Amino acid sequence: ATECTVHENYKAKILKANDLATVITGQITGHPVRVIKNKLANAFLAAEKEEGSKENPDMARFDQLGTGALQKSVKLGDVDNGSVMSGQIAGMVNKEESCSEIIEEIMAKFNELVK
């Protein structure tokens, strides 16, 4: 939404996403997160694959990768090295609208369906 305070690069990354743009990272930590694929997501997935095969995975590695990652993308606009959290629905978001426009569109479709 236009009222959303995330960095413009974050919004642009969501708008460019397609239906295959997201992956789940963090499963090894017990805190899975769906994110848009980028350098950080790829590094996280590679670390999970490597550490997941070990009897005693180096969990500090995930702390190092994740610390400050959301701030990088949300506040600083680094959508390559930051965590760009997004659901699978990102591929269906194709324009930025105000909250009121989004709600009006939802209600119009609802009213159309209940006739």
Q: Where do the language-model regions lie?
A:
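Conserved active-site-proximal phosphate/metal-binding subdomains
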Residues: 1-115
